[in-house]
C-alpha cells in the first residue's frame, strides 16, 4: 500500500517536500564538535576567503585528521535527525578526503589516480560507523545526507532553490564548478514535490480524468527538471570535472584505487567496499521509470543489478517509498496496463510525453558522460564503479522500448495525435544511439566523434 508520506525526520517524501529535506540542513555542527567543524572549514583545496586549504598541500589534511577527538560517546547520545544528518555528512567528507587525498595529489602530478589510503583512522571510523548505523546507512559518502540533498544552504534565505542561490555546507575543491555541479542536483529536485504528487495521484486515480490530471503533473514536473538539468553545461564547466571527481569515488568497483577495500579501524577487522557518491542515487529517474513502466523494460544485466544495489544506498524512507510505489504499479496495476484497459487515448499520449522527458533526461545525461568524463579521462570507471560507455546507453534502450509499446496502443488522429511525425522523431533517437554504440565499441575511439553525432541528428543537449 502506498502511503501519503515517508519520513525519517530529516527527509519526508510527500507532495510538500518531494525528495528535499524537510527544512534547510544544519550548516554547522553543534558546539561539541568544534574541532571537526574547523577541519571541515579548513579542508577545501580553495577556501571561502580564497586562501589554500588543507587538501591543497600533500599530507596536510591527513595530519590534521589525526588530531581530531574521537567523538564516539557524544555521537551515541544524539537523537535529533538534523544533527545526525550533519554528523554523517561531516564524517563522510573527512573519510573520503582522508583516503583519497593521495589519489588527488597523484592525479595533479601524473594525470592518473594512483592509490588511496586504505585505513580510516579510529577517531573517524568509530563515530562515523555509529552515526551511519543510526541512520541505517553504509559509512561512506552518499548522495542524500552527504554530498548533495543534505548539503545545501540558501545564500539569500528568502530566495529559491535555483543553484545560483545555493551554497555547499561541506566541500572538497571549494571551486565554483564543484558547487554548480552538485547544487544543480538540489535545484532539479525543487520540482520533486509535483513529481511525487503526480505519481501518487496516478496510483490512486479512480477514473480517466484523475489519471490524466496526474499524468500531466508528472510530465510538467519532468519538463521543468529537464530545463534545469540542461543548465549543467554552464553551472559546471566540463573541463573542470576532474578538480573534484576523485573525492567522490567509491571503493566498490574501483579496485585500481582502493585494492580490496577500506579498513575501518576499531570497527571491523576485515576491509569493506562501499559504492561511491553518484547521481544514480537520485530518485527522480527511478520514480519516473516506475510510474511510466520503463522499469519493466530494464535489461536483465549487471547494470540493472547495480541500479537495484543502489537502492540500499538511499535513506530507509526513500527505499520504502520506491518499494511501495513499485508494488502499487505492477502487473495490471501498472500505468500502461491501466491506460490500455480503459483505452484512454489522451492518457497514452500524456504518457508518451512523460517518456519523451525521460528520454531527454537520459540522452542529455549521456552527453554529460561523453563530455565531463569520456573527453576528460581515459579511466573507464565511474564514481559509482560502473563501466560507463556500455552501461549508461543501456537505460536509454529501455526508454525506447517503452515508447514503442505505448506507441502501439495509440491511435493515429485521436486527440490530434500525428503518429507519422512521432515515428520520424523516434527513429532519429534510435539512429543516434546505434551510431554512438558502434563508435564506442572500438577500444581507441575518439569521444568527440560520439559527441558530434548529437548535433548531427538534432538531439544536442547543450
Ligand atoms: C556532469 C553531470 C553528470 C555526470 C558526469 C554524471 C555521470 C554519471 C555516471 C558516470 C553514471 C553511471 C553510474 C555510476 O555512477 O557509476 C550516472 C548514473 C546516473 N546519473 Fe548521473 N551524471 C551527471 C549528472 C546527473 C544529474 C544532474 C542527475 C539527476 C539529478 C543524474 C542522475 C543519474 C541517474 C538516475 C543515473 C543512473 C543511470 C540511469 O538510470 O540512467 N546524473 N551518472
Q: Can you describe what each PLM-predicted range is?
A:
Residues 1-462:
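Surface-exposed peri-terminal alpha-helical interaction modules
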Amino acid at each position: 500500500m502506498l502511503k501519503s508520506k515517508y519520513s525519517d525526520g530529516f527527509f519526508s517524501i510527500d507532495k510538500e517536500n518531494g525528495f528535499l529535506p524537510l527544512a534547510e540542513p544544519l550548516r554547522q555542527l553543534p558546539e561539541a564538535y568544534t574541532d571537526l567543524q574547523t577541519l571541515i572549514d579548513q579542508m577545501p583545496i580553495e577556501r571561502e576567503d580564497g586562501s589554500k586549504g588543507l587538501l591543497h598541500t600533500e599530507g596536510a589534511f591527513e595530519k590534521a585528521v589525526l588530531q581530531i577527538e574521537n567523538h564516539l560517546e557524544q555521537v551515541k547520545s544524539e537523537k535529533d535527525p538534523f544533527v545526525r544528518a550533519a554528523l554523517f555528512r561531516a564524517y563522510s567528507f573527512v573519510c573520503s578526503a582522508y583516503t583519497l587525498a593521495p589519489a588527488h595529489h597523484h592525479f595533479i602530478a601524473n594525470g592518473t589516480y594512483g592509490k588511496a589510503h586504505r585505513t580510516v583512522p579510529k577517531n573517524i571510523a568509530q563515530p562515523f560507523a555509529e552515526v551511519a548505523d543510526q541512520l541505517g546507512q553504509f559509512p561512506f559518502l552518499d548522495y542524500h545526507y552527504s554530498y548533495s540533498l543534505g548539503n545545501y544552504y540558501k545564500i539569500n534565505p528568502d530566495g529559491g532553490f535555483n543553484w545560483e542561490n545555493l551554497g555547499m555546507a561541506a566541500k572538497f575543491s571549494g571551486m565554483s564548478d564543484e558547487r554548480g555541479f552538485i547544487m544543480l542536483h538540489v535545484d532539479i529536485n525543487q520540482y520533486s514535490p509535483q513529481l511525487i504528487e503526480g505519481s501518487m495521484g496516478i496510483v490512486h486515480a479512480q477514473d480517466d480524468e484523475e489519471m490524466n490530471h496526474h499524468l500531466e503533473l508528472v510530465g510538467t514536473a519532468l519538463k521543468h527538471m529537464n530545463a534545469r538539468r540542461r543548465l549543467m553545461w554552464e553551472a559546471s564547466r566540463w573541463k573542470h570535472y576532474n578538480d573534484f571527481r576523485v573525492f567522490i569515488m567509491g571503493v566498490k568497483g574501483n579496485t585500481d584505487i582502493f585494492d580490496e577495500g577500506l579498513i575501518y579501524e576499531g570497527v571491523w577487522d576485515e576491509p569493506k567496499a562501499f559504492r561511491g557518491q553518484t547521481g544514480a542515487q537520485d530518485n527522480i529517474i527511478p520514480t519516473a521509470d516506475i510510474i511510466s513502466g520503463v522499469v519493466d523494460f530494464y535489461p536483465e544485466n549487471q547494470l540493472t543489478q547495480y541500479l537495484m544495489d543502489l537502492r540500499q544506498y538511499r535513506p530507509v524512507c526513500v527505499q520504502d517509498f520506491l518499494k511501495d510505489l513499485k508494488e502499487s504499479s505492477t502487473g495490471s496495476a501498472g500505468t500502461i496496463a491501466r491506460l490500455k484497459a480503459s483505452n484512454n487515448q489522451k492518457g497514452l499520449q500524456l504518457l508518451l510525453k512523460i517518456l519523451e522527458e525521460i528520454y531527454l533526461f537520459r540522452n542529455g545525461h549521456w552527453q554529460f558522460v561523453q563530455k565531463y568524463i569520456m573527453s576528460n579521462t581515459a579511466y573507464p570507471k565511474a564514481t559509482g564503479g560502473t563501466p560507463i560507455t556500455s552501461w549508461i546507453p543501456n537505460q536509454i534502450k529501455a526508454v525506447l522500448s517503452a515508447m514503442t509499446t505505448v506507441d502501439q496502443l495509440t491511435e493515429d488522429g485521436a486527440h490530434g495525435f500525428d503518429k507519422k511525425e512521432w515515428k520520424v522523431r523516434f527513429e532519429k533517437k534510435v539512429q543516434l544511439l546505434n551510431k554512438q554504440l558502434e563508435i564506442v565499441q572500438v577500444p581507441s575511439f575518439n569521444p568527440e566523434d560520439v559527441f558530434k553525432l548529437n548535433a548531427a541528428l538534432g538531439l544536442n543537449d547543450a
